[in-house]
Amino acid sequence: MSTIPITKRGAELLKEELHRLKHVERPSVINAISEARAQGDLSENAEYDAAKEKQGFIEGRIQELEGKLSAAQIIDPASLDVTGRVVFGATVELEDLEDGTKLIYQIVGDDEADIALNKISISSPIARALISKEEGDVVAVQAPGGNREVEILAVRYV
């Protein structure tokens, strides 16, 4: 299995979710299954069916998280010697050269991406265009509204 790049914070969030699933959700659904079984006939027991379905989801998610964490390559951009260059984990301040809009994005792993928090996936067209570029570079990026030119104003590693 290939490695999955992830920030330290992203790995912490996955570990927190895994802990919650194993120590809160799993015991809760096991209890719900036991209670539904105690009601007798399982062939038409909606509570039992719902609890078993939820159990399947929880177990699947636990396996998925364990797989991701075992393949995770935690990257701390602050520890890299890449001053001024865009790398995984960097926070990049951009200016859209067409309308002057300023944008700030952090480049993160696929599981961490959340545009509402200005976190974009390393596999997104914008991030792929920015990787390895430096402060002051003008970069053509694919955006939903078409190609745009942006200037990299600053690169921070937090």
Model-derived regions, located:
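Residue-level signal for pocket-adjacent positions within structured domains
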Residues: M1, E16, R37, S43, ...
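Helix-rich terminal scaffold detector
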Residues: M1-E59, Q63
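Non-DNA-binding regulatory cores of transcription-related proteins
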Residues: I75-V158
